[in-house]
């Protein structure tokens, strides 16, 4: 029957957090929920990034952040912070002060550090480059401008990106402006 629902989260310790006090439901409406382990998600990203590096292929993340506006940017943010772990750990205090949001991608980092003193900005940029050098090459949105698919959560939309890669024989654009075999996650 029609009525109101309350959405709650109960953590592992039993503490309850109300996520939404009142959600109107119509008769016959189906409500479902799911959960995901952040630990397992991050481990999965670590494995896939390492595998792309071992196979010398591009690493590419494909989500639907324009439609899945709550979940997919969070998934994207975890991928960004796993790939650039050293940067986010080393510069955590600075990023917190600047309001950097990993869910908005590497582009948010670039925007927020733009106003820092030149030496501090250069250090962060060098650390980003070190992560890129240590990891697999990234699938590029725009290789001419250095825009990776970890820059903005809505730049690579699975509905458009995957058919293109499949039609191209599993190849995507790399940092060198050339096509390369691609691991799609």
Regions found by a protein language model. Give the residues of each.
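Extended, well-ordered protein cores
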Residues: 1-77, 86-185
């Amino acid at each position: 029957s029609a009525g109101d629902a309350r959405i709650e989260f109960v953590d592992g310790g039993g503490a309850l957090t109300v996520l939404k006090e009142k959600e109107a439901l119509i008769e016959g409406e189906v409500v479902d929920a799911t959960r995901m382990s952040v630990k397992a998600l991050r481990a999965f990203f670590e494995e896939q990034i390492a595998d792309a590096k071992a196979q010398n292929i591009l690493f590419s993340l494909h989500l639907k952040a324009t439609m899945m506006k709550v979940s997919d940017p969070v998934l994207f943010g975890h991928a960004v912070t796993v790939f650039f772990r050293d940067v986010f750990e080393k510069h955590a205090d600075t990023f917190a002060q600047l309001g950097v949001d990993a869910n908005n991608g590497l582009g948010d980092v670039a925007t927020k550090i733009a106003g820092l003193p030149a030496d501090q900005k250069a250090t962060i940029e060098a650390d980003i480059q070190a992560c890129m050098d240590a990891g697999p090459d990234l699938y590029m949105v725009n290789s001419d401008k250095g825009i990776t698919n970890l820059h903005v959560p809505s730049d690579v939309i699975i509905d458009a990106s995957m058919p293109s890669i499949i039609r191209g024989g599993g190849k995507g654009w790399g940092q060198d402006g050339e096509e390369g075999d691609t691991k799609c996650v």
